[in-house]
């Protein structure tokens, strides 16, 4: 598994320490183990998890600005845990409403000794935003309009929304509320992953 991850990282042009690689592989091992009982992801093959969960998450890292992020609807910690492993100086709040997912996140935090994540069981609308976050991240969480509507209280004035999408969601972009605009759209390259991947970065047009 470690060799596969190393090959994919080389192909993607991503440089990580051995410690970070080992942590990512250990996380996949835990996800595979817990998935059998908790049904945390539809991906059953650990080798496929490396591509569809690990690489697909960490390719976003170069685009994140700031230190404090919240991953809304994180599920089993995606993309928050892989990002926390590769960005040790940033902090990630991992938010999910399902208790079984948050229990898994806390176990990952304990076993991998990740000090830069905070798993939280809560609905996003009910979660307080003090202090504000630099970035709100989502992967397969909601439409862009729903994301900014439900999470508008979370980022600071200069905070951004980072939405991981497959094909470019042109209809969703066109439907954004007037007080939000797309700052940039980044086409992501994920080795061995079929289909397109995009990162949509949204800012609030606060006066």
From Swiss-Prot:
It is found in: Cytoplasm. Gene3D superfamilies: Vaccinia Virus protein VP39 (3.40.50.150). Keywords: Cytoplasm, Methyltransferase, rRNA processing, S-adenosyl-L-methionine, Transferase. Pfam families: GidB. S-adenosyl-L-methionine binds at residues 73, 78, 124-125, 139. GO terms for molecular function: rRNA (guanine-N7-)-methyltransferase activity. It catalyses: guanosine(527) in 16S rRNA + S-adenosyl-L-methionine = N(7)-methylguanosine(527) in 16S rRNA + S-adenosyl-L-homocysteine. CDD domains: AdoMet_MTases (cd02440). Its EC number is 2.1.1.170. SUPFAM superfamilies: S-adenosyl-L-methionine-dependent methyltransferases. InterPro entries: rRNA_ssu_MeTfrase_G, SAM-dependent_MTases_sf. The keyword Cytoplasm applies. GO terms for cellular component: cytosol. HAMAP family: 16SrRNA_methyltr_G. Belongs to the methyltransferase superfamily. RNA methyltransferase RsmG family. Specifically methylates the N7 position of guanine in position 527 of 16S rRNA. PANTHER family: S-ADENOSYL-L-METHIONINE-DEPENDENT METHYLTRANSFERASES SUPERFAMILY PROTEIN. This is Ribosomal RNA small subunit methyltransferase G. It comes from Salmonella arizonae (strain ATCC BAA-731 / CDC346-86 / RSK2980). The gene is rsmG.
